[in-house]
């Protein structure tokens, strides 16, 4: 890494001394992996206060339910072999304590450096972390989006409602066990004069296969 990035890395590592974290550099950016999700708010607060990470650019999450699984195992470039259409396969059960990871992207304009803060969430049944809306007001909508898409709850959020999906929507679309076709379909009923919801009649099919290529 460059001398400049090394200096920032050393400073960030020093600031977080005492927390159970792992700091490393990947793809030219500093990454911080928090071991205990109860430390998320404290770590982020310290980064903002002591290294001027005053801008939260994004919050997202990853669902590792199907990590390492594929629809086809291939040893060649896909374009050389092609795929047959197939039905969506069922999912295997993931490690309940490592299914979800939450990710924060921070920017310090004063130091001209970015960090990526990540934390594996320990309970996939009731997923709850502390809100950082009190640190960055922009977290309000970002946390609502993560809740809407992944079903992760945020303690002390002032208005934790869905922000992208429709009223009465069931499920969380970016979870790996959410069907690509959804659960219901919507159409306008001319006889009733209103929009109605009906169970989806389309079978799940593999249109964009998940592939692990053996190099």
Swiss-Prot record:
Its main location: membrane. The keyword Repressor does not apply. PROSITE patterns: COMPLEX1_30K (PS00542). It is found in: Cell inner membrane. It is a peripheral membrane protein. GO terms for molecular function: NADH dehydrogenase (ubiquinone) activity; NADH:ubiquinone reductase (non-electrogenic) activity; quinone binding. It comes from the Bacteria. SUPFAM superfamilies: Nqo5-like. Belongs to the complex I 30 kDa subunit family. NDH-1 is composed of 14 different subunits. Subunits NuoB, C, D, E, F, and G constitute the peripheral sector of the complex. This is NADH-quinone oxidoreductase subunit C. It comes from Francisella philomiragia subsp. philomiragia (strain ATCC 25017 / CCUG 19701 / FSC 153 / O#319-036).
């Amino acid at each position: 890494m460059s001398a400049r990035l090394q200096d920032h890395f050393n400073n960030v590592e020093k600031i977080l001394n005492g927390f159970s974290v792992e700091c490393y550099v990947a793809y030219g950016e500093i990454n911080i992996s928090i071991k205990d999700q109860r430390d998320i708010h404290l770590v982020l607060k310290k980064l903002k206060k002591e290294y001027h990470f005053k801008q939260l650019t994004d919050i997202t999450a990853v669902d590792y339910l199907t990590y390492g699984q594929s629809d086809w195992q291939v040893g060649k470039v896909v374009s050389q072999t092609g795929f047959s259409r197939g039905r969506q396969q069922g999912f295997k059960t993931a490690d309940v304590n490592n299914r979800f990871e939450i990710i924060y992207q921070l920017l310090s304009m004063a130091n001209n450096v970015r960090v990526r803060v990540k934390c594996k969430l320990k309970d996939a049944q009731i997923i709850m972390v502390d809100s950082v809306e009190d640190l960055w007001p922009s977290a309000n909508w970002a946390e609502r989006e993560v809740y809407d898409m992944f079903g992760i709850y945020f303690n002390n959020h002032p208005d934790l409602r869905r922000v992208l999906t429709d009223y009465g929507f069931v499920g969380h679309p970016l979870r790996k066990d959410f069907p690509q076709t959804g659960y219901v379909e919507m159409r306008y009923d001319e006889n009733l004069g209103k929009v109605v919801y009906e169970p989806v009649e389309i079978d799940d099919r593999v249109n964009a296969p998940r592939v692990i290529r053996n190099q």
